[in-house]
């Protein structure tokens, strides 16, 4: 099916290094990422041509997706009507594939290849059978023109788990296989020999070929006989960073769905079908492998100096005795406490989390829930828990508003095993941030007895009513503006939200509909408020002024400042006949931000100035939305304005004077110099292009609608969680990869694989340990990726910048025994995992390990050029 492609030709067709599009592969050249990826595409095509199957098993973060897309694109160049199906773990990852294909088409492909694939349209399919958005529907759409029509469908592996009707649950395994066989037959009826190529991302999902799950049964029915006429595709391309995810037999189990491998050892199968290279990152001192910069830490928790947590634990122990008496249970009784209980109201336990590995209940769950909620009702706060405590101390910056605070250290990724833990961690971290925000607001408003007010307000759970009656600036609470039609936040009615940032939201159904905080943000958004231009870019995107605004012939209608300045930027003129000039030209804060960038960061200034006006306009919408809805900067701005009002600089009779005075006051106080606003401005510019192209899927150079960044409006909490019950996970991925919220993301295994979370984060916490080294590596791989924060730090600062991996545990408990046993065995298995050759991982817990288990924590190895030996090279 493929033309004859050599390595040089592939490097000419696909530009794997966008900074050097003239780069060409030559024999004997120095090892580089682009050379590795060219070799990968070539090696995969050779294996597909020879064996009809290839396994791309490169280490996490090496660009398996773009290599697979390279293979697919060359297939379409060779056979323009090729039919291709991609199976990925979930629809979020399917969307990432679509984004990456558009990147390849518009950026990586040379003119010839771009022309050859211009007709390809990636289609996200809900599942195989959906009448409106199913794979079968798309196949039937082209059945009358198969010779000319190509096909590129993407759907989720999870769709194989939902084929059994409710009335057939008693015989679900047989029914799942039967339903999948029907799908196979319907595909074969139209496509005859099936798809030209099926690509399976995270192929280790199919490592349990002999398992008794619906997914396994459905997979056997869908994929057909490995060597028979029912085979779903002519060729299969499998992707996984952990081919021996749990043990070495996983290799043949995965391949066994598509090829008869019974006569081969796992090692022989890897030699024949696999490409596996180990990742390296070019940095300040040379090429690093992961052991040069990974730094593992333990976070030891205990009851010392925390009598409240010890008291709660004693009450918990007493409740266990009262409930179970002397009956067994042993260490299983401790799982709920050690993994973390939930002190807020529980959600439904019947939720799809993608795997049995994320469990909801332990033996002690109900006891913990009752005790913790009683505690919460009594003391208005969650009961102390030492393991939660050490995590909170590490993830919540006490110096958030200090001049020396570095926001690039605010991102933290946390993995748990129990589903309630993600909500509890989120609730506690948001509560800690609320204390920081509340103190900042009280300092700005300077009410009498603010220390006493702080405690009273906290006891009222940061009540809107208490804030309005006892704290907020009475002279500045009401604005005569129309209300913005705000969509409610992700967690608008949730008890785990940030209650302080909730003050900035208009609550149409609340008895306290508006607050001084919501009125302030309303000023910065509503077009009829002059302050809505405060965070807009300058007229020339540098330091330019604005001269006029729109009015209405109807005196009952309000002026429109925002539309006027946006029209001016777009058309270099205003578009209404009803124009009034400002009393004097007005600037925005953008001018001061630009001047400070010019004075402090010449390289980043070059980046910003290299952008077209279209890109700068897109960036301005992104930046303003993030600042107002998904960052602590809204608190900073509110505090500035409150101090400005208290200083009696606000002119309530002339808004233009008030606006100019506010800008002058900020300038004279030199507030921008060390502000969060400026820090976020710098951080947002630094990663904007990567966020657009790699995460969001927006064209960096084309006009986009102002609401393109509306997902950020739903992220006004510092912490959030990802589990099966969270529907829109894409916005969490966007937010976490931006400088904006969430700063802390807690996740079950649903974010363990295939999700890119690397642009802003270099810290991962295993609150609940992974079950295997393979799963542990997948978790770390969410942030240990090329071109992310870890890689940027290696380029800038070298080996010492590091990737930090944390393991919290409760000292002198079963928790310590679990962790010690895992760490000792993990190190031996990591080397075997690198080579794809480990034997069974022993999950048993050794209770005899001494304190020297800490020596097994990974510390950065002394640097020398990594010299990785690839276990299964491409050529």
Residue ranges and their predicted role:
Residues 743:
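Glycine/proline-rich, flexible active-site/cofactor-binding loop segments
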Residues 1-47, 52-740, 748-760, 797-875:
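Helicase motor interdomain insertion/brace
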Residues 767-770:
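Short beta->alpha connector loops at strand-helix junctions that form conserved
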Residues 772-795:
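Conserved SF2 helicase motif VI
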